[in-house]
Amino acid sequence: MFFVLSPAKNLNEKDPAPVSEFTQPDLLAESDILMQQLRELAPQQIAELMHVSDKIALLNAQRNAEWNTPFTPENAKQAVFMFNGDVYEGMDANTLDIGQIRYLQNHVRLLSGLYGLLRPLDLIQPYRLEMGTAFANLRGKNLYEFWGDIITNLLNDTLAQAGSNTLVNLASQEYFKSVNTKKLRARLITPIFKDEKNGKYKIISFYAKRTRGLMVRYAAEHNITDPEMLKNFNYEGYVFNDAASNESEWVFMRSEQIK
C-alpha cells in the first residue's frame, strides 16, 4: 500500500532535519530540464506566470539561480521536512520516531511540479512550481504535458517492486491529475474528509488538507499495511462512514461538537 500526497508551497528551509538518512530524487534529470527553462524567467515573468507578488517572484528567481546538483545534506533537505503546509503540519513528521519515518519512506510518495515524484527522504532544494502552472516547456503547454506518463510509470514500478496493489490518494485534484489512472496498475482509494457545519457535512479545505497528513501519521504510528485498517482512523474525532462510502471513495466525518 502506498499513499500519494501533494507538496506544499510553504517551505521550512531553516530548521535542520531530525534524521540524517536521505535518498536522491529518481527524476532529477527531468527536474534539471525544467529548471534550465525556469532560470530564463525574470522576476516579473515569474510573478505573471505564477500569480505571485513581486517579493515572492524575486525570492524564487534567486532560488532558481542557486539551484544546482548534486544534492547533498549541506545544500538540500529531505522533502518531508522541507514541505511546511497544512498537510505536513497534520503529519508532523518531526515528532515521528525513526521507525515511523522509515514507514513513510516505504509507503508514501509526494507529487511535485518540479521533481515529479518524491520519496519523503529525497533531498530537494527550495523551489516554487505548482503542478497546475501553465508553464510552456519543451514537451508541451503545461506541466501535465511535460510529465506525461513519467510519474505514472514510476508509481507502477514502485508498486510492483513492493508487491503492492493499492494506492491511497491523499493528493489534491491539481496534483493527482498528473497520474494517468487509466494506466495505473493498482486499486485506487480516495479518502474524503467532511466536517459538520450548521447541521450539514461538507469538505472544509483547511481541515481536509490537515487531515490528509493526519491519516498518514496514523498509518505510520500503527504500521498499517492493510488498507482496510485505515477505516479505523479516528484522529481528532473523524469516523469512517460506511453508508456514505463506496469501494473507491472512503468518507470520514466529524461532528461539530467534537472540534
From Swiss-Prot:
This is UPF0246 protein NMCC_0856. Disulfide bonds: none annotated. Belongs to the UPF0246 family. It comes from Neisseria meningitidis serogroup C (strain 053442). It comes from the Bacteria. One of its GO terms (biological process) is response to hydroperoxide. Pfam families: H2O2_YaaD (PF03883). One of its GO terms (cellular component) is cytosol.
